């Protein structure tokens, strides 16, 4: 779900566009990974974007607020982030969260939150929380925190 600009798709942002910013950094004590979706001011967002953003945010909050016992796997938690989208017949094609390393890779396992995440989560494991929704050719939304 990472956009790659090409000569054919390269253009200036316009009022009413949604701009998805995926950023992070590596520091002595760890790695960061954050994504935000912002509206370029001047026009209303694309049709359906407010509802989709709200559903993504609800899923993000549900996962962030979850309290669960040691041994719960990522597949069990994945449903919390997807449920608001599923209620509207929507979904996203990527995992909800990935392990995060320090000095190695921002995407590091074995822990992950996804439809296939079978590794039991344990204290000390860092996993991202990044549900999204992508309306092909229209807009994309993702909210990510660690």
List where the protein language model places each region.
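Active-site neighborhoods and metal-handling regions in enzymes and metal-associated proteins
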Residues: 1-146
